[in-house]
């Protein structure tokens, strides 16, 4: 048997790599008669043979489209994956957040190796691996009135994958002023909703649906309300489907009817579509006499924070609040039995992680007691108006509400709220407790 030297093997390996490179270059070359590379024809073939896509004509619409995605989170990740896979020519990603370990159960573009990386950069790397034919641009900024127009002007369509009313109103307003169609969705828990706004600049816009924003205290985030990964992922995937339908011209001005699609994953999966009203003549953005113009937005005259409001969590005085450090040194380490600790998180939160000496009374139940000390004693037998009570929640917000209730309605004199809540305590004083 003839032995092959290391030099020959190395040369053969080099020739293999050069051959693969040349083959790739050949596949990527366009014929003068072909609008795409041979590799692209093969990649998108299964998609092009679906009758509704109009074959090569539809694929070229995707290739020539520029789509901006606001948010690379639970909605944006699946939408980005499927839009990139479908062959959108240019995709822009706006997100100034970084990948956190708590994102990974639902934000499927990211992985453990990307924790700490900007989400838009993590998404760009993943998309480049999935489809090198897509041009990806990233914007690691917080979208606001000062940069929105500059970013939006480079694109044809916008996907609103954000989770705050402030951003939703801004995205819709800017899109109306630029004549852009918006595919908008939101999701929380096991539910989500989706709609198309300002279709072909004929409306309706977000303000037509919601002329008045919801009360700030009624809006929860994924961080507060939780989210089921596959449920939010399904809504994000539907966003990609609706985007393709818009680009393929499945929707026309003649057949498009404004709608709101609502999905629920639990206990039984349901998907319902509701007919929505069209453009409103009195709408301040897309109506007959618009007040929300580009000039008004860019100058800061349209105050989105003032319009949408913000939660007021400054319910307690400085004297009614203590730091996690003081709670540890002056209460836990010294006299744990000399105080009552009430944890006002929901029970399923409490069951995940809690102090052993804590008594769990969710803030909703505390409100329902209507200031009755006798009812409170059913859960805390040794409580009195002279008790020393410490109140704890997840982040130090609901605990302020509970502190006010205990002092103002139950007339307990010595009540203190732990600033930053249970998670602040874990971060600063004791890492052994699970943080969810």
From Swiss-Prot:
Database matches in HAMAP family: MOCS3_Uba4
Alphabetical keyword list: ATP-binding, Cytoplasm, Metal-binding, Multifunctional enzyme, Nucleotide-binding, Nucleotidyltransferase, Transferase, tRNA processing, Ubl conjugation pathway, Zinc
Subcellular location, principal: cytoplasm
Record-listed Zn(2+) binding positions: 205, 208, 283, 286
Domain annotation Rhodanese: ranges: 335-434
Keyword Oxidoreductase among UniProt keywords: no
Record's GO cellular component terms: cytosol
InterPro entries tied to this protein: MOCS3/Uba4, Rhodanese-like_dom, Rhodanese-like_dom_sf, ThiF/MoeB/HesA, ThiF_NAD_FAD-bd, Ubiquitin-activating_enz
Primary role: Plays a central role in 2-thiolation of mcm(5)S(2)U at tRNA wobble positions of cytosolic tRNA(Lys), tRNA(Glu) and tRNA(Gln). Acts by mediating the C-terminal thiocarboxylation of sulfur carrier URM1. Its N-terminus first activates URM1 as acyl-adenylate (-COAMP), then the persulfide sulfur on the catalytic cysteine is transferred to URM1 to form thiocarboxylation (-COSH) of its C-terminus. The reaction probably involves hydrogen sulfide that is generated from the persulfide intermediate and that acts as a nucleophile towards URM1. Subsequently, a transient disulfide bond is formed.
Residues bound to ATP: 74, 95, 102-106, 119, 163-164
Source organism: Vanderwaltozyma polyspora (strain ATCC 22028 / DSM 70294 / BCRC 21397 / CBS 2163 / NBRC 10782 / NRRL Y-8283 / UCD 57-17) (Kluyveromyces polysporus)
Protein name: Adenylyltransferase and sulfurtransferase UBA4
């Amino acid at each position: 048997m003839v032995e092959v030297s290391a030099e020959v093997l190395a040369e053969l390996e080099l020739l293999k790599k050069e051959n693969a490179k040349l083959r790739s270059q050949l596949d990527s070359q366009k014929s003068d008669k072909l609008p795409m590379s041979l590799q692209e024809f093969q990649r998108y073939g299964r998609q092009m043979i679906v009758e509704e896509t109009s074959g090569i004509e539809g694929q070229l619409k995707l290739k020539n489209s520029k789509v901006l995605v606001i948010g690379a989170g639970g909605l944006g990740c699946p939408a980005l994956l499927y839009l990139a896979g479908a062959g959108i020519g240019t995709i822009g990603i706006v997100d100034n957040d970084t990948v956190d370990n708590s994102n990974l159960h639902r934000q499927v573009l990211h992985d453990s190796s990307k924790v700490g990386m900007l989400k838009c950069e993590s998404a760009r790397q993943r998309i480049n691996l999935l489809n090198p034919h897509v041009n990806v641009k990233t914007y690691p900024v917080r979208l606001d009135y000062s940069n929105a127009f500059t970013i939006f002007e480079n694109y044809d369509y916008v996907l609103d994958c954000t989770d705050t009313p402030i951003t939703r109103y801004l995205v819709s307003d800017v899109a109306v002023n630029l004549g852009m169609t918006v595919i908008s969705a939101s999701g929380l828990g096991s539910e989500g909703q989706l709609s198309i706004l300002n279709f072909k600049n004929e409306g309706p816009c977000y303000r037509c649906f919601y002329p008045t924003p919801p009360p700030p205290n009624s809006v929860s985030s994924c961080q507060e309300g939780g989210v089921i990964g596959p449920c939010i992922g399904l809504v994000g995937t539907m966003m990609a489907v609706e985007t393709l339908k818009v680009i393929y011209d499945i929707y026309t001005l003649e057949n498009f009817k404004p709608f709101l699609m609502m999905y629920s994953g639990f206990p039984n999966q349901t998907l319902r579509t509701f007919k929505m009203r069209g453009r409103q003549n009195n709408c301040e953005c897309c109506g007959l006499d618009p007040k929300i113009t580009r000039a008004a937005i860019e100058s800061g005259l349209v105050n989105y924070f003032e319009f949408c409001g913000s939660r007021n969590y400054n319910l307690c005085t400085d004297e009614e609040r203590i730091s996690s450090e003081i709670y540890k040194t002056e209460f836990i380490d010294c006299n744990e039995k000399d105080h009552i600790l009430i944890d006002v998180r929901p029970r399923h939160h409490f069951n995940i992680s809690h102090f052993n000496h804590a008594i769990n009374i969710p803030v909703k139940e505390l409100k329902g007691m209507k200031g009755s000390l006798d009812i409170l004693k059913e859960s805390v037998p040794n409580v009195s108006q002279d008790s020393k009570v410490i109140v704890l929640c997840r982040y130090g917000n609901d605990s302020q509400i509970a502190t006010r209730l205990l002092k103002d309605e139950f007339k307990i004199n010595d009540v203190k709220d732990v600033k930053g809540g249970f998670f602040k305590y874990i971060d600063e004083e004791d890492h052994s407790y699970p943080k969810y």
